Amino acid sequence: DEMENCPLCPKLLERTELFGGIIREKVLLQTEPDVWMPVYILIPPAKEGRPGCVLAPHGHQGAGKYSVAGCREIPAVAEAIDRFHYDYGLYLAKLGYVALCPDARGFGERRDKAFQKEEEEAFMRGTCFHLAHMAEPLGMTVAGMNTWDLMRLIDYVEERGEWRTDDLGCVGFSGGGLQTLYLAAL
């Protein structure tokens, strides 16, 4: 019934240079004890001054952070990007913002694979339905857990200290819009 604070223990898993000088980092953050959230961080080319940040939570049916960060290696993700303009994190980085694209609980690398196959179609969906049914008897909601994780992501931005926190935004489509709305309320 309550989220437990803990050290973030950030782990840099990969750092890749994309086209146009954008850097994509994959970072793993501990949002609660033994609860880890993978995040793609898209960093624009260096300019004068520190860039602002935008949290870019994903919605449903987009394979978590992959589509928002513009990862086109998986054909179904590329199709979602083309169909729904789902790569808004990458677009923000092209505009000069640092875009932080996390996997919400039940999606991407955080989905419960016991309920799904490893096929591409299953990868596009989440398992938040199952997670919700496990959380509710404990007095918790998936939306609340995801909002907590976004708050911890802001903690990481502040702890890292490389980017402006007075120019911090959040934008998402569908379920990512819901996460944005709840985060703004807190």
Where are these regions (language model features)?
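Beta-sheet entry/capping signal
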Residues: 38, 52-54, 96-99, 167-169
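Primarily recognizes the serine-hydrolase "nucleophile elbow" in alpha/beta-hydrolase
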Residues: 145, 152-186
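Short, hydrophobic/aromatic alpha-helical segments in well-folded domains
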Residues: 25, 42, 87-88, 153, ...
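Short amphipathic alpha-helices and their capping/turn segments at secondary-structure boundaries
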Residues: 39-47, 89-92, 182-185
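Cap/lid segment of the alpha/beta-hydrolase catalytic domain
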Residues: 49, 56-151
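N-terminal cap/lid segment of alpha/beta-hydrolase-fold proteins
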Residues: 2-55
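An acidic- and aromatic-residue-enriched active-site/binding cleft used to recognize and process polar
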Residues: 32, 44, 59-60, 104-107, ...
